[in-house]
Amino acid sequence: MALTRSDVIKAHPRNNVSDYIFNKVGVNLHHRREHPLGILRTAIQEYFETKVATDGKPFAFFDDMAPVVRIEQNFDELLIPKDHVSRSSNDTYYVDDDTVLRCHTSAHQLEKLKAGNERFLVMGDVYRRDTIDATHYPVFHQMEGVRVFDPSEWEAAGMDSTAFAEQELKNTLEGLARHLFGDVEMRWVDAYFPFTEPSAELEVFYGGDWLEVLGCGVMRQEILTEGGSPEKRAWAFGLGLERLAMVLFEIPDIRLFWSEDERFLKQWKGANESNWRDLRFKSFSKYPAVFKDMAFWLPEDADYGGESNSIENNLCELIKDVGGDLVEEVKLIDEFTNPKIGKTSNCYRISYRSMERSLTNEEINALQDTTRDRVVEELKVELR
């Protein structure tokens, strides 16, 4: 069932979801087969269908889970500490005191384990308050994978349960990397995630650089126990579809994934399992940017949440709500503290650029005026 505006934007003091964000809910770009995200999703799914399920036990695929989840699903069930920075309203979209827009597809992990699923992928849109630039967007798409093992499997291999699960995990994901990138050099880097131990990130050498492909690890036993399988072991991984698609298809700006411009959409027509690796984005006319600076004094008692108590995520959210996808980048270009008055000044440069037409100073000035008014009213700053 489709979510309505009242399901996501509520008259609740904790709600920080804008109409701009709500309008992305239910778009489901990963469902579009002739779209870079849909193409990549299909390629990954094909790998797990044909390369992994060799013992007759296929992976289940879930790609239509509602993005509003309980706070416990998003954090507690994944063993994320109560004081973790990601719980801040500076980083997470809260619907009310009980629910959020999911920050990761891992929010459905325990739910699927409790339902008896032991091999599955979850795909969907996820939401995070973040900075604005060519590689960051408040809505993106993730894929979560889980595989559970019975004791008989590691006993037959004569291995310790953790070592067995880790070996199976790395073999599976190295195969996925080869499926996507070809015969590339790979390396494993130790990492930390609250819900896996040991944890690692897989990197591939592609296009002359090391690229982080995914994060993964052996699932923490507490999660399996809560899921009803204390005697079993499991691995889990997660990856961002946009991050990989930008590299594989040479897409330079993350906003392009949301474009309805036919010059973008027609480039992916006819994509299939035999030709998708040859597809590359062909740039069309890049219209000039319009730059606007905004300088302001921060209030002395500012509390913007998060570990750094930075205004940036809140400011970016507000600017995006006003300017939508015309906003290309928001960048802090100057910061100083005046010792005489004890105040700190920030100056941000906002880059506006349309993918489809030239912008006029008049229309951007109107957006900028609205933004300035809202910044004063909502963030309590003093414009300079």
Located regions from the model:
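Class II aminoacyl-tRNA synthetase-like tRNA-binding/catalytic domains
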Residues: M1-Q142, V148, W210-L224, E231-K232, ...
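Short histidine-centered catalytic/ligand-binding loop motif
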Residues: N28-R33, E144-E166, K292-S308, T360
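Short amphipathic alpha-helical segments
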Residues: R32-L40, I44, S161-T172, G306-L315, ...
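Short secondary-structure junctions
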Residues: F48-F59, A177-E185, I319-V330, V376-V381
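Beta-rich nucleic-acid/ligand-interaction surfaces
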Residues: P58-R87, G182-G207, L332-I341
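Conserved short secondary-structure elements within globular domains
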Residues: E118-R128, F181-M186, V327-E335
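A conserved active-site cap/scaffold subdomain adjacent to cofactor or substrate pockets
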Residues: H136-E174, R178, G228-R263
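A carboxyl-terminal module marker
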Residues: P194-R384
